[in-house]
């Protein structure tokens, strides 16, 4: 077992309290403008923007610092078409057979169905995989810990980074998602966590009229 090695926390920045309050409010005001979008433009997005946002996600905390995620960025039209075809096949079964009535009723205000044109229209599909274990070149395996929690945190940071860059996003989770590992050639140690669709919203994009819970409903101070 290796001994831990530490270094000074030189990256930390201390701000005056007034500036901290200002920064927190400005960040809040920006983040609450974020909306899930299903109508995307095919307008190109520079690859560097996507790379920077993924690097932000890659800086997320994780269980034992194992960083159990892999971001597969899909730009190729043929691959996007394959993903759309497979996703719509699963979604058709979901809406017609698999989903219980309560789930369909919960989805109704969002106006969703089995048709997923955004999977081909948006310039980028970021397919996020969760790694249950890592594998070295010699075949030895290392178990990962708190995988869902770690990948969830990284995904949230990615969504926020993309919003900060001026892009819209959609989290898409067709069920089941085994086809993604097959299409994208990922290992048996990985499972698809979700598809993050990103790009510019179309000029005609609309979002559902829905409400978030109040601060008091989701927060308790002791």
Regions inferred by a protein language model and the residue ranges of each:
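N-terminal accessory segments that position/regulate proteins before the catalytic core
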Residues: 1-37, 41-51, 85, 93, ...
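C-terminal helix-cap and adjacent tail motif
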Residues: 2-23, 113, 191-222
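Glycine-rich, charged/polar anion/phosphate-binding loops
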Residues: 56-58, 109-114, 180-182, 205
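Glycine/small-residue-rich phosphate/adenosyl-binding loop
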Residues: 67, 73-151
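Short, electropositive alpha-helical surface patch
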Residues: 180-193
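Short alpha-helical scaffolding segments that buttress acidic/His motifs in well-ordered protein cores
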Residues: 31, 53-57, 196
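Small-aliphatic-rich amphipathic alpha-helix that forms the alpha element of a beta-alpha
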Residues: 34, 55-58, 126, 132-183
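Glycine-rich phosphate/pyrophosphate-binding beta-alpha loops
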Residues: 58-65
């Amino acid at each position: 077992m290796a001994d831990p090695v530490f270094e000074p926390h030189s990256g930390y920045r201390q701000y005056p309290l007034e500036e901290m309050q200002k920064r927190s409010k400005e960040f809040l005001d920006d983040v609450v403008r974020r909306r899930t979008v299903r109508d995307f433009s095919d307008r190109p997005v520079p690859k560097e923007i996507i790379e920077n946002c993924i690097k932000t996600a890659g800086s997320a905390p994780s269980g034992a610092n194992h960083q159990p995620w892999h971001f597969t960025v899909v730009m190729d039209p043929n691959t996007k078409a394959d993903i759309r075809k497979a996703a719509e096949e699963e979604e058709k079964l979901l809406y017609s057979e698999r989903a219980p009535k309560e789930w369909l009723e919960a989805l109704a205000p969002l106006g969703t169905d089995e048709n997923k044109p955004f999977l081909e229209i948006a310039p980028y599909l970021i397919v996020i995989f969760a790694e249950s274990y890592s594998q070295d070149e010699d075949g030895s395996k290392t178990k990962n810990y708190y995988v869902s929690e770690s990948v969830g945190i990284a995904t949230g940071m990615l969504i926020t980074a993309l919003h900060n860059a001026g892009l819209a996003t959609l989290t898409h989770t067709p069920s089941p998602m085994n086809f993604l590992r097959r299409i994208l050639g990922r290992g048996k140690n990985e499972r698809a966590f979700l598809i993050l669709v990103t790009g510019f919203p179309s000029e005609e994009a609309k979002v559902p009229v829905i409400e978030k819970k109040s601060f008091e409903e989701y927060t308790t101070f002791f």
